[in-house]
Amino acid sequence: MQVVAAVDKFRGTATAREVAQAIGQACWEAGHDCAEFALADGGEGLLDALGGANRTARVSGPLGTPVEAGWRLHRGTAVIEMAQASGLTVAGGAERNDPLGASTAGTGELIDV
């Protein structure tokens, strides 16, 4: 049997690449071939799913504290992961998030790099 493991991350647990590799390992142990593909919906995990080396830029986080956000050039196109500049994890998480005081200015700064 041939299996295709095309998966996104398990939020807070494993990256898309780790999930695909775990499925691939289980398939191999069961005697099946598996093609592993890490996917992303464009948010958190996008750059990891693309693979390769990222560049980073220091930008304003959603609550004003500077954060390091990744980006890269992929086949002549700049790819950013908005979650690294303005996502919930850099906005204090679900417990400390301040939607009315937060800003996505850091995403704009990342685009301007």
Give short role names for the model-derived ranges.
Residues 1-113:
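N-terminal loops that bind phosphate or other acidic moieties
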